[in-house]
Amino acid sequence: MVATPSATTGLQVAQDYVIADINQAEFGRKELDIAETEMPGLMALREKYGTEKPLKGARIAGSLHMTIQTACLIETLVELGAEVRWASCNIFSTQDHAAAAMAARDIPVFAVKGETLEEYWEYTHRILEWGDGGSPNMILDDGGDATGLVMLGSKAEQDITVLDNPGNEEETFLFASIKKKLAQDPTFYSRTKAQIQGVTEETTTGVARLYKMQKSGELPFPAINVNDSVTKSKFDNLYGCRESLVDSIKRATDVMVAGKQALVMGYGDVGKGSAQSLRGLGATVCIAEVDPICALQAAMEGYRVVRLEDVVEDMDIFVTATGNYQVIRNEHLLKMKDEAIVCNIGHFDNEIDVASLKDYEWENIKPQVDHITLPSGNRIILLAEGRLVNLGCATGHPSFVMSNSFTNQVLAQIELFTKGNEYGKEVYVLPKHLDEMVARLHLDRIGAKLTELSKDQADYINVPVEGPFKPDHYRY
């Protein structure tokens, strides 16, 4: 496919992809070749299902960070028979060479690092539009934006007033993009929704949206909660963040973490990994939590459990990892010390009240790193404009841990596409034996050797010799 520069943006635009620079495709392919050696789960699925092609006929609309690791996921889906259209789920998370590598294979991808919010929603629409006028029949989501777009658009077809009062800048662009689409095609969203056989969701915040729809009876198709597979949440969320958080802070600021005081807000799996990473480089780490169980866990690990308002003037580094909104508000930002570093590793950009800083003086240091001068004269360093710091200021999680997550995604897509009529309009998790299979596929790469139960031992603890080894309620 031939790409030509847009006269208005300079981006590479073709009939069926929008990327920054097709000339980066060779670089992307070289990095993808390395990533494949670190993604044994995906490679095993290609070998197992490549001939069978269980996803033949699947049209997957993918909304997930367009990274090198995601490129490996995309190529696995294609190898298994799927047609794929892809956009990033964050305006800063795209790796342009990864997007170029996909475009060079004629895989429709719409993702540019640093795209505007207007472009973001335009690109998310593009993954729902098949060239033959058809629709996707599967969604692979991260954060729920693709699913949410279909659902909100369907509501707007019936009542356009749902788009009247945007609550923030992002909703302003989202609502405008839906109105624009409805003017072109008044039944686009309901037709698309009717074709969807299922959705697989990658992350905590997107899963919360699905459960909310299920509770209200609005979920129109089955969904698989990939996030709560043990081999996703206990690995990607924990060990991935343990490596990628400090990587992003160091790349963005070059500061010495040792000796700094850091506050991690939220002590779920992401917060646990984040706290470990900062402590590992010598920071004194405190935790802010609302959940008494998580707070007790943090205390038992030796962290001080504090309230933000009690320590805000003392901290050097602030990390939000809650999945909630307005966690760090303007009154907190105004009290921060000079050169405090503020960042977010939760999925959405509303954990930090960045909008309240817009009236202050901003100095851009480099992409996704801004100095903001407060009324007190102190300057804070805001990373990635409050969006995902590990993908905005670095390259996200390492390939190996993402292989765990993405192997779950492929299995979930196969499950819903081939057996969708066996599922109701509810949110499901993958069965335990598949979770254990994902783990098993990754052991050899790191030299781990499993001990095997004898028949007598298996009978004694009442499990099959080959597993599953734990009941569904086991917490790991």
UniProtKB/Swiss-Prot annotation:
Pathway the protein contributes to: Amino-acid biosynthesis; L-homocysteine biosynthesis; L-homocysteine from S-adenosyl-L-homocysteine: step 1/1
Biological process, per Gene Ontology: L-homocysteine biosynthetic process; one-carbon metabolic process; S-adenosylmethionine cycle
Protein EC: 3.13.2.1
Gene Ontology molecular functions: adenosylhomocysteinase activity
Family according to the record: Belongs to the adenosylhomocysteinase family.
PANTHER family linked to this entry: ADENOSYLHOMOCYSTEINASE (PTHR23420:SF0)
Protein name as it appears in the record: Adenosylhomocysteinase
Organism: Synechococcus sp. (strain WH7803)
